[in-house]
């Protein structure tokens, strides 16, 4: 790896700190704000594994491991508020919108939504979580603008499992295409404009998804499966 001189490193850390400070009031307590900043730092550090223990061990000025773990697993804060704030920081509001699944390899049974399903990160069926994500493409750059965890139907209908992981009663099964359309509507309401919506065949083959985009007055460029019948 190329060496980074101390002056450049300090400048990057200063810019990162200023960026993270812009989200401070999304969290109600000081310990949450500190843990949030350090969790982001952990995602950027050089630990090969992004487990809590690996990230915590490389933090420059760490909170306790228990505090960092509690922030992710039990601390009450709303991801939607963080996403709203992130969208306000973007320097562009117009471009192409790319919708896709994001596969997160994950073992075990106690992470919400984990099961054997197609994982793009591995290119095969594997134990993972899947999120529906929307990315704005503009000026040769990509900007994440929405993301929501897909909770499979089996999870939503298993009361014991829901209780064990604290899945809120408001979470009900929604197909991925419905999550994607909800994200598009949210982004339009937030003032974004799209030259077109892009998606792979998992979305493009679904007629209900395409019709929803048409009703919103949006152009789209989507892949379809070779066995799709049109008339």
Residue ranges: model-predicted function:
Residues 26, 41-45, 58, 120-121, ...:
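Short, charged/polar micro-motifs that form catalytic or ligand-binding hotspots
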Residues 27, 31-109, 219-221, 229:
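Electropositive nucleic-acid engagement tracts
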Residues 63-67, 156-167:
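Gly-rich Lys/Arg/Thr-decorated short loops/hinges at beta-loop-alpha junctions or inter-strand turns
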Residues 1-27:
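Basic, low-complexity segments
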Residues 71-153, 158:
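Active-site-proximal, Lys/Arg-enriched surface segment
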Residues 160-231:
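An internal, acidic/charged active-site-proximal segment
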Residues 38, 129-132, 178-185:
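Short, contiguous clusters of charged residues that form electrostatic/catalytic patches at enzyme active sites
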């Amino acid at each position: 790896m190329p060496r980074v001189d101390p002056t450049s490193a300090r400048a990057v850390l200063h810019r990162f700190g200023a960026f993270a400070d812009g989200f401070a009031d999304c969290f109600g307590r000081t310990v949450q704000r500190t843990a949030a900043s350090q969790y982001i730092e952990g995602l950027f550090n050089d630990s090969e594994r992004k487990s809590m223990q690996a990230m915590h061990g490389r933090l420059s000025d760490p909170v306790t491991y228990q505090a960092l773990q509690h922030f992710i697993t039990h601390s009450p804060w709303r991801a939607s508020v963080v996403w709203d704030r992130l969208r306000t920081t973007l320097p562009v509001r117009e471009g192409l919108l790319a919708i896709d699944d994001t596969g997160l390899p994950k073992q075990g049974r106690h992470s919400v939504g984990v099961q054997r399903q197609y994982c793009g990160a591995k290119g095969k069926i594997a134990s993972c979580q899947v999120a529906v994500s929307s990315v704005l493409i503009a000026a040769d750059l990509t900007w994440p603008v929405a993301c929501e965890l897909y909770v499979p139907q089996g999870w939503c209908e298993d009361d014991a499992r829901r209780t064990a992981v604290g899945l809120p009663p408001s979470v009900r099964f929604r197909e991925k295409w419905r999550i994607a359309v909800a994200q598009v509507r949210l982004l339009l309401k937030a003032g974004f404009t799209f030259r077109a919506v892009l998606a792979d065949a998992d979305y493009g083959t679904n007629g209900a998804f395409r019709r929803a985009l048409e009703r919103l007055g949006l152009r789209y460029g989507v892949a379809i499966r070779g066995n799709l019948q049109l008339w």
